[in-house]
Amino acid sequence: MAYYQEPSVETSIIKFKDQDFTTLRDHCLSMGRTFKDETFPAADSSIGQKLLQEKRLSNVIWKRPQDLPGGPPHFILDDISRFDIQQGGAADCWFLAALGSLTQNPQYRQKILMVQSFSHQYAGIFRFRFWQCGQWVEVVIDDRLPVQGDKCLFVRPRHQNQEFWPCLLEKAYAKLLGSYSDLHYGFLEDALVDLTGGVITNIHLHSSPVDLVKAVKTATKAGSLITCATPSGPTDTAQAMENGLVSLHAYTVTGAEQIQYRRGWEEIISLWNPWGWGEAEWRGRWSDGSQEWEETCDPRKSQLHKKREDGEFWMSCQDFQQKFIAMFICSEIPITLDHGNTLHEGWSQIMFRKQVILGNTAGGPRNDAQFNFSVQEPMEGTNVVVCVTVAVTPSNLKAEDAKFPLDFQVILAGSQRFREKFPPVFFSSFRNTVQSSNNKFRRNFTMTYHLSPGNYVVVAQTRRKSAEFLLRIFLKMPDSDRHLSSHFNLRMKGSPSEHGSQQSIFNRYAQQRLDIDATQLQGLLNQELLTGPPGDMFSLDECRSLVALMELKVNGRLDQEEFARLWKRLVHYQHVFQKVQTSPGVLLSSDLWKAIENTDFLRGIFISRELLHLVTLRYSDSVGRVSFPSLVCFLMRLEAMAKTFRNLSKDGKGLYLTEMEWMSLVMYN
């Protein structure tokens, strides 16, 4: 069953290998000793196979940072920067390039690094968090690092061996994947998602006509991580080339600009190499000290061009598109660049967690899993993004896998109604395959579509024993929903007393009576509170519900005092909606708990996860959006039901009702 993210998904932290950081640290402090992690020991098994030759492996020793030459160790010295990172003996540029981009984004790095030090409550134990299949996983490590000749074997600490957060974070990631050998060559997409839980946009530089400067600026504005990769060279290993670039290598994209050059403008892009030293920088046009920088009269020249031996450099966008093969953007929501590189903020998400398919190794038809979704309205450009993340487990990760362990197809279901599972005959008779996946093995795979309105089914099959995975389906929302905030009447931004229109509005719709019914309330709300398309309006049934919840005389009408109480809530709910919305006019069902927390009338009211799941089904549409009228009905009903229970319960734990009392309570409200 599909569900939308609940607060427990965001707040609960999974303890990797059931290791609790606080318990382990406090135990070590009480015993006066430093932590030794037996689940990732200071041994050859943690380095893994095929990374080092046996002779070199025998020379590896493990030391804590304070035992290395240099000044006193620090977790973070001054501030976090990509220049704190220097790649070592593992070919994990794919991880370090993503990490370099992460350093520019406080939103993500705070989730991963947390506050730690080598002084306060130091016990030789550190922790880091990674996103795995919809949940944050906390990995605990000790601070013993593999060294040779007093030099760290893998990521090198900078600032005279004094700053160690990159080394320790790399070790935690190696533990998560199995060993340091599992860091040796990988995919940028996997690292980006593991560090953020975001969605990947893959730009094929040789074939995609993209305005790179605008794309980078758009993605940066959205808080995205941006990386890129070079193609392989004559060998299947990273090799430094004459132009200063490295083949089969990952880089961090750090900026892009239009710069004045001669009598026109030229587009340039800034990159950083995780090798972290000047010899591994681009030597062509716009490189450090090049003729182009001498000739430009751009007033930003001194700001942009800082010649340092740090692995960062500029190059022209034209050269970039020729020399690099792909650029990867990772963001909380899909970044679609098919319509002028504009950022479309209105997306809803359906998430299927902990999905397991049992394979069929004995031959015969393969087992499958099916996931349904609907496209409601036609729109231009990419409107559906399907993301697959395979769990990091020994059964899923096998080096001999040459292809993605799951096959995926998106199939148009036509007029077929959704059911638990379509039979095989359905697929043989309809054959409406939109797209299938066919890709080399990686743990994260993203497919983008432009789909017409209709019902669709995602079919997943596995090639071997079993596979556990997360499936996320992002559906673009139409502009009318995205700009719902513009449908609010601006007179509602103040409190009722500020605009002074409550009484006059009521009198106008009461038509010389002292009260209004549901039909009059519907006209009042849709004319005075909302000005938008019909789908955003209060329905008659919703207005009947509001009347039933607010009236005290049980006559199906609201008098002026009852209307004043309703109006006060509507104004407050509007502020709640605008505060909680994911993007302008878009409130997702996964954020209903935030609406509860921000509603003054619900102080002291708590609901369970099970009830929260039920109300998301009750008050959201097919793609997980909650309209303003639906939010109003939900919040008012929750307040009314909680107050009713407290009024009727004698002990606050339960209540006794006759059948007629129960029926009267639930049928009218």
Swiss-Prot record:
Active-site residues, Swiss-Prot/TrEMBL: 93, 249, 273
Any one Gene Ontology BP term: proteolysis
Function: Probable non-lysosomal thiol-protease.
Keyword DNA repair: no
Residue intervals of the Calpain catalytic domain: 34-333
One annotated Gene Ontology cellular component of this protein: cytoplasm
InterPro entries, per the entry: Calpain_cysteine_protease (IPR022684), Calpain_domain_III (IPR022682), Calpain_III_sf (IPR036213), CAPN3/13-like_C_EFh (IPR054069), EF-hand-dom_pair (IPR011992), Papain-like_cys_pep_sf (IPR038765), Peptidase_C2_calpain_cat (IPR001300)
Organ and tissue specificity: Weakly expressed in lung and testis. Weakly or not expressed in other tissues.
Domain of life of the native organism: Eukaryota
Family stated for the protein in its record: Belongs to the peptidase C2 family.
Species per Swiss-Prot/TrEMBL record: Homo sapiens
Record flagged with keyword Protease: yes
Domain called EF-hand: residue spans: 538-573, 636-669
Pfam hit, one: Peptidase_C2
EC number(s) given by UniProt: 3.4.22.-
SUPFAM superfamilies on file: Calpain large subunit, middle domain (domain III), Cysteine proteinases, EF-hand
GO molecular function, one term: calcium-dependent cysteine-type endopeptidase activity
Top-rank EC class of the record's enzyme: hydrolase
Name of the molecule in the record: Calpain-13
Gene3D superfamilies per record: 2.60.120.380, Cysteine proteinases, EF-hand
Keywords for this protein: Hydrolase, Protease, Repeat, Thiol protease
SS bond partners: none
